């Protein structure tokens, strides 16, 4: 029994576009976003144990308090559970970076614990209460995320692109950015056309935006500098901020273009976290 080990990567969540539709009476905002999950992320391992324990390693472990971690909160969603688990998180994804790292961690742990304990997943209602964007992180296919994040649907796509992600270390807390939003930042509901190939995807994305970008740039002007440098790279089809920032990304048709852009940006921002990955395949 003690030799059982379950493990998984916990992928980053990238908002290819992010529209804020309006503010609800409960204070939350209604969103509309196309979400992709490049094969980059933290690593999670789970072992059977008498109690629930969490250990964190990796270059960012000191920035992540254990007591308030979403992983521990997620483990408590299994009602009337008497099982335990040793959970090991190797944390390498930037925190407060617009990549949904905490929500992705929680989603992966929910799936692994369900498998380890052979019990059903908690209700979607309970999962949403823990984190509005945890449900979309339960599946890594291309998805449209609406409502407060609890309304998700799969989007069919063909072909693949290469994504270059860059984070300069700025912390952009989501609640801070949303507090600065005004109706002038809101968008109307749109229809997503059939995405028959990567060309149609890029054409569609160019008609969209990230409604949080302008607000975040006012607080963190360095993000505008990052985006300007993405536009300087050869082959960049579109550049944008993910989520509430501060991570920015560029999409490329060829891996060689993304790698060349990575080398260029590393020269300009040598202390940044920067990764290349395939998406939409």
Where are these regions (language model features)?
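ATP-binding N-lobe of GHMP and related small-molecule kinases
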Residues: 1-97, 115, 119, 157-159, ...
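DPxDG-like acidic metal-binding loop motif
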Residues: 71, 97-124, 136, 140
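Short, well-ordered alpha-helices that flank and scaffold nucleotide-derived cofactor binding pockets
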Residues: 76, 111, 115, 263, ...
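Charge-dense, low-complexity intrinsically disordered segments
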Residues: 61-65, 100, 217, 252
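Conserved glycine-rich beta-strand-loop-beta hairpin in the small C-terminal domain of fold type I
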Residues: 245-248
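Short glycine-rich phosphate-binding loop at a beta-alpha junction
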Residues: 240-242
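Generic structural signal for hydrophobic residues
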Residues: 71-74, 109, 226, 261
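ATP-dependent small-molecule kinase catalytic core of the GHMP/sugar-kinase superfamily
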Residues: 2-36, 118-238, 251-281
